[in-house]
Regions:
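Conserved, mostly hydrophobic/aromatic
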Residues: 25, 69, 120, 141, ...
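Short proline/glycine-enriched turn/loop motifs at strand-loop junctions of beta-rich domains
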Residues: 26-33, 61-62
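Aromatic- and acidic-residue-enriched carbohydrate-binding clefts of CAZyme catalytic domains
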Residues: 116-117, 155-193, 207-259
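Hydrophobic faces of well-ordered beta-strands that scaffold small-molecule active sites
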Residues: 116-120, 149-151, 197-199, 262, ...
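Short, solvent-exposed turn/loop segments enriched in Gly/Ser/Thr/Pro and often Arg
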Residues: 151-160, 201-213, 266-271, 296-302
Length: 318
């Protein structure tokens, strides 16, 4: 099993301190895995590692490159893509999440009991339906006395408008909203105005259109059903990698996007009868991140909101 690093994202395409691209893909049933660079017309071979992971380190991948992951010759978007500029069926685009220039170094998250929350849908909150449109209306929210906004899910879904609960790329920020850098810019602007940011995330199911995860591995299980389709595989065979995938996702929002709290959708549908429920493990991992990498911004970053009373003791951090 690949090690979970709370200080950086491992899955997908990321960059080392030396600027080299590090690629990591979980595809336990594949015989060959490559990266196809669309614009450069280059194919890079990944090496088969333990537990179904494939990887390579290369200087040939740079930010802005569009690419596909090739599984036994079939081209697919990266399951850990952070940007899908052409939507769910198009190529993934390489983004260096660490390149954004943050100005919120003095931000300290406010206590949860002081949150005055405005829940908003990015696509309908402003005339442009974008993160930039939210920034333009921040003075209005400040005037209302809002201290936190809760953004409905932004994981890439099919089309330009959706409630957000049909996302199929959990790491990718919706292209029609502006993509990942625009979300970083929004959070930075919110903190400058004294507003905390809560992000709604969905870990119990994926949407019906554009879902490539089953082609990579057993991300789903037939042990359980949800009202929205197959349940995610948190406790069946090969579930360690699936648990890792969603754990990396939660940590990414806190670390790379400076999100202050996560609202987990329908936690009752996260079916897990492991000795340690995934939600409890999430609590421990976020606490570890909070203790090891705390900054002025992070002193209260380990607070998470949940949808049910049952889940609150597992996800609330004090």
């Amino acid at each position: 099993m690949t090690m979970l690093r709370v200080n950086r994202k491992s899955l997908g395409v990321n960059f080392s301190a030396r600027g080299e691209a590090e690629v990591l893909v979980w595809a336990p049933e594949a015989k060959t895995v490559n990266v196809w660079l669309v614009d450069k017309q280059r194919r890079l071979e990944l090496i088969n590692r333990e537990f179904g992971y494939w990887s390579c380190i290369t200087p040939e991948i740079t930010p802005g490159d569009q690419y596909y992951i090739e599984l036994d010759g079939k081209q697919l978007p990266d399951p850990a893509s952070v940007y899908q500029p052409e939507g769910v069926t198009g190529p993934s685009e390489v983004v260096s999440l660490g390149a954004f220039h943050w100005t919120d170094h003095q931000w300290i998250n406010i206590p949860q009991q002081e949150y005055i929350i405005y829940e908003l849908h990015t696509g309908t909150f402003s005339s442009s339906g974008t993160f930039e449109g939210i920034i333009e209306k921040l003075p209005y929210l400040v005037e209302l006395g809002i201290t936190a906004i809760e953004i409905m899910p932004v994981a890439q879904f099919s089309g330009a408008r959706n409630w957000g609960y049909d996302g199929v790329f959990p790491f990718a920020v919706q292209n029609s909203y502006g993509g990942p850098v625009a979300l970083q810019k929004l959070v930075d602007a919110c903190h400058a105005q004294g507003i905390a940011v809560i992000l709604d995330v969905v870990y119990n199911h994926l949407g019906p259109e554009g879902n490539v995860l089953p082609m990579f591995g057993p991300y789903f299980t037939d042990k359980y059903k949800t009202p929205w389709g197959q349940a995610m595989n948190f406790d069946d065979a090969h579930s360690d990698a699936v648990r890792h995938y969603f754990m990396e996702n939660a940590l990414m929002w806190l670390r790379d996007f400076h999100i202050d709290a996560l609202r987990l959708d329908a936690v009752h549908a996260i079916k897990d009868f492991s000795p340690k429920h995934w939600l409890r493990e999430l609590r421990e991992r976020v606490a570890m991140y909070h203790l090891r990498f705390r900054t002025g911004r992070d002193r209260a970053a380990a607070r998470s909101l949940a949808t049910t009373v049952l889940a609150q003791p597992l996800l609330r951090f004090r």
